[in-house]
Amino acid sequence: MEEREERVRDDTIEEFATYLELEGKSRNTVRMYTYYISKFFEEGHSPTARDALRFLAKLKRKGYSTRSLNLVIQALKAYFKFEGLDSEAEKLKTPKMPKTLPKSLTEEEVRRIINAAETLRDRLILLLLYGAGLRVSELCNLRVEDVNFEYGVIVVRGGKGGKDRVVPISESLLSEIKRYLESRNDDSPYLFVEMKRKRKDKLSPKTVWRLVKKYGRKAGVELTPHQLRHSFATHMLERGIDIRIIQELLGHSNLSTTQIYTKVSTKHLKEAVKKAKLVESIIGGS
C-alpha cells in the first residue's frame, strides 16, 4: 500500500513539474519547487493551508531564513493552484522581505579577484559574472554556440522566468573567451565544464560558488557570485549608463528591481561611457 502511494506521489510530482514548465518557470525554479513539495508529502502532510503552515513552522524552527521560507511558500501556492485549490493557496501569505542594499565591490577589489584566478577557465568565469552580470545558473547553462563572435554578444538562455536575452560583451572579453576555447581539448557543447571529471559535464552551480569563495579569500574579500553581478550593475550606473539599459542587461522584468542600485551608487552624473570600458579597465590593470 505504501509503495503504491509513493508511486502515485511521484507521478503527481512529475505532473507538477510539467505544469511548472508550461507556466514558463525556469529549470532552477522547477527543481526547487518540486524538491520542497516532495519534502512536504514525505512528512505526511495533506494539501491544505493548515498543513502547509505546520510545515513552514517546522522549517522556521530549523533555522530557515525569511528568503528561504518565501521560496517554500511560493512552491506550496503553485502546487495548490496546480491541484485547483486556489482558496487554500490564497490563505498562504508571503512575509515581507526586508529591503537590504547589495554590497558592491570596488573596482580595485574586482581587479584583485580576477588576478587571483589560477586557470583561464576560472578567470573567464569571474569575468563573465562581473563583466556580463550573469546569474550562476545562466553561466552554467552557456553553450559555446551561444557566443556570437561576429556580433560581439552572448545569448543567455533560460534566465529568470525562462526568458532568453542577448548581452553585448566587449572585445577584451571576446578575446578572453577565444583564448580559453583554444586551450580546451574536449568536444563538450558547454562553454564551461567540470575539470576533474573524466566525462566533461557542464559546470555545476556548486563548483562556481566554491571557485568564487576561493578567489575571494585569495583577494582578501568576502565574496559571493551575486556580489559580482551587483557590482556590474553598480559600476555601470556610476559610469552614467541608463538604468533601463542595465535592467535589460541584467534580465530584470521590473525596473523597481534594478532601481535598488541607485541607492548604492553615488556617482550618477558621470558622462556615459561605452560598456566595453568596464571590462577593459579591469583587464588593463592586470
Curated annotation (Swiss-Prot):
Cellular component GO terms, alphabetical: cytoplasm
Keywords in alphabetical order, please.
Answer: Cytoplasm, DNA integration, DNA recombination, DNA-binding
Q: Where in the cell is it found?
A: Cytoplasm
Gene3D superfamilies membership: 1.10.150.130, Intergrase catalytic core
GO-annotated molecular function: DNA binding; tyrosine-based site-specific recombinase activity
Domain Core-binding (CB), residue spans: 7-84
Q: Which GO terms describe its biological process?
A: DNA transposition
Q: What SUPFAM superfamilies does the record point to? A: DNA breaking-rejoining enzymes, lambda integrase-like, N-terminal domain
Q: Which family does it belong to?
A: Belongs to the 'phage' integrase family. XerA subfamily.
Its quaternary organisation is: Homodimer in the absence of DNA substrate.
The protein depicted here goes by the name Tyrosine recombinase XerA
Q: Which species?
A: Pyrococcus abyssi (strain GE5 / Orsay)
